[in-house]
Regions:
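Aromatic "clamp/platform" in nucleotide-sugar-dependent glycosyltransferases that forms part
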Residues: 265
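A short, well-ordered alpha-helix in the C-terminal region of glycosyltransferases
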Residues: 311, 318, 325-340, 346-352
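Conserved donor-binding/catalytic core segment of Leloir-type glycosyltransferases
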Residues: 4, 178-199, 205-209, 217
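Membrane-proximal helix-turn-helix segments that form the acceptor-binding/catalytic region
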Residues: 62, 66, 119-141
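Nucleotide-activated donor-binding/catalytic signature segment of Leloir-type glycosyltransferases, i.e.
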Residues: 226-244
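Acceptor-binding helix/loop patch of EC 2.4 sugar-transfer enzymes
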Residues: 47-50, 96-129, 182
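Conserved acidic donor-binding segment of nucleotide-sugar-dependent glycosyltransferases
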Residues: 297-298, 302-309, 318-324
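Short hydrophobic beta-strand element within catalytic cores of glycosyltransferases
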Residues: 282-285, 295
Length: 362
């Protein structure tokens, strides 16, 4: 079986969003262990279509068709619901897509915030129509958190959904010196790409204010960076690092922080949190979306309710004061990662689904 993997999802705290491409490569290698041939490409290098900034791509699909003709994939796996997936479907090639978050909620927040302009709203709606068609006509949707199943079925009732808890090669995540931070410290490593998710970072306003002896670091970027920095940068114990080199810069950062924090208004099973788990970091995260599927309260981290800054303060102080507890929770986080977020397990599940579809097709 030959699988063509198309990487197109944006976002992420690594420069140029390389993190998502990097981990799809790990997925491909796990497929190879099972005797499956794979090819990983960046979808925008082959097809973009309208609407996009690449005007030439609106018309020409030559590179895409050449790729398909030369590689002859049995299955195409896309992590973005855009033109690559759509053109694959048009050619009648079995296509599976991967959903990392609540796309519909992200779109609604975008309309309320950065896409208020009529033109940009139109662009957003056009992109969403393409995504809806991909969701409706593809052979199945792999989802990164169980809670997304209900979300998907609300919008695409007949969709075939499959659990796909994105893996992580824990061997790549080991202590590496090289970054100097002030201690004690709490580290965040997340993007600010839609307000429904990002606004929860403002809960830390009172946390940072009331914990002047603790330093707070944020690595990440995104269109909502400015309103966050306007509030948090007034504190001397808050430090913004921007984007980090991947994976080395992120690994050095996670090595140095004392606690990993995930304040979020909506998320699934974020990559940076899995990386922190691999590094045995004690974790505190907001109890929303798919976060409880990776942070088991009092076992692999602590969960707090949205807006509850007092819980943040109490849990941070608890971790800092009780080193034995911090180590226990950190060890529990890595153990859970190895058991649940394993590429070999994910690859086997994918192959079962793909082969079942091909057998039924033939």
């Amino acid at each position: 079986m030959k699988v063509l993997i198309a990487s197109g999802a944006g976002g992420g705290t690594a420069k140029k969003s390389i993190g998502k491409y990097f981990h799809l490569q790990e997925f491909g290698k796990a497929l190879e262990k099972l005797g499956v041939e794979y090819k990983l490409v960046r979808e925008t290098e082959y097809v973009t279509g309208f609407p996009s900034k690449n005007v030439k791509g609106w018309i020409s699909k030559k590179k895409f068709h050449s790729l398909i003709k030369e590689y002859k994939p049995d299955i195409v796996f896309c992590d973005c619901q855009s033109h690559f997936a759509l053109e694959t479907i048009k050619l009648g090639i079995p296509c599976f897509t991967y959903l990392r978050g609540n796309r519909w909620m992200e779109v609604e927040w975008a309309k309320k915030t950065i896409y208020k302009d009529p033109l940009m709203k139109t662009v957003l709606e056009m992109r969403q129509k393409i995504a809806e068609r991909v969701f409706s006509e593809c052979q199945g949707i792999f989802m990164t958190a169980d809670y997304l199943d209900k979300v998907i079925k609300e919008h695409i009732p007949n969709a075939k959904t499959f659990h796909f808890l994105e893996g992580l090669d824990a061997s790549r995540w080991y202590p590496e010196e090289g970054m100097e931070l002030k201690h004690p410290c709490v580290g965040m490593c997340q993007d600010a790409n839609w307000w429904g998710k990002t606004k929860e970072m403002l809960t830390l306003d009172q946390v940072i204010k009331q914990m002047p002896d603790v330093h707070f670091y944020w690595a990440g970027d995104g269109q909502y960076k400015k309103p966050i920095l306007e509030i948090l940068e007034k504190y001397d114990n808050f430090h913004y690092l921007g984007t980090l080199d991947y994976p080395d810069g992120v690994r050095k950062y996670l090595t140095e922080i004392d606690i990993y924090a995930l304040p979020t208004g909506m998320d699934t099973t974020p990559l940076s949190c899995r990386e922190a788990m691999a590094m045995k970091k004690p974790i505190i995260g907001t109890k929303v979306g798919g976060i409880p599927e990776m942070i088991y309260d009092n076992k692999s981290g602590f969960l707090v309710e949205e807006g509850n800054y007092k819980a943040w303060i109490n849990n941070i102080r608890l971790f800092l004061d009780d080193k034995e507890l911090s180590k226990k929770i950190g060890d529990g986080a890595r153990k859970l990662l190895l058991e649940k977020f394993n590429w070999d397990v994910v690859a086997k599940k994918f192959v079962v689904v793909a082969e079942s579809h091909l057998a039924h097709k033939n």
